[in-house]
Amino acid sequence: MSNVDEIISLVLKEPKQDGGDFSGFDLKGVSLNGVSFAFATFMKTVMEEAELSDINFSQATLGSSSFKNAKIKNVNFSSANLEGVTFEEATLMGCNFKSANLTNCDFSQAKLADCDFQGTNLDHSSFYSTTIDNCNFAFSRMLYAFLKQVIISKSRFGGVNARGSDLSFSKMTEVDMKGAILKYADFNSCTLTDVNMTNSNLIGADLKDAQCAGVQWEEVNLEGSDLTYANFEGANFKNAFLLEANLHGTNFTKANLSDAYLVDANLAKAITKDANMENTILA
């Protein structure tokens, strides 16, 4: 049974519902604006197809709730517990998720714009085919997250820990990933444009067939990684560490490999035409 009329009646009388318990409520299609639910509890609450704007969910508990297909604008989720929440196919604009717990969340096919996820826990979350524009994920945890076919533009992922995450077939444009931990991550068939990976850790990462022309890889650690047939034309690998990397058929045309460490790397059929190999260590 829908609880929409009940919640609307409550917030019309008192828009400040901090600390309330709305667990299990069916709020499908509800439209709320300017309401505060700080420290409130919304366990397993349905807010699918809802329209939410200027809502305060800071430090609220919303575990296992559903915002599927919701339109969410300028909502504050900072320090909230959102474990297991689904935002599948939702549209989120200008939302604040700073320091929130988003483990096992589902953002599949959602559209995120101007959102702040700095310092959030997104372990085991799903961003399958999600569109992310001008968002901040700096220093967030995304261990073993599923980001296959994600489209990311003009966003910050510096210092993120995305060990073991799946970013295969992803498309990134103007993304800052400096100092990111991406050990054993899957970038198979990704397309990176104007991406900065300086000082990132990609030990054991999979970059087979990746399209990364012109990308910044300065001082990156790619030990034991697989770059088979990847395109790094014009990319910057100055001081990069590629010990035992698989570079079979990799295109380094006009790339900067100066001072890079390629000892025991597989260079069979690798293309280094017009590449800068000054002080490159091959053996």
Name each region found by the language model.
Residues 3-283:
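Tandem repeat scaffolds
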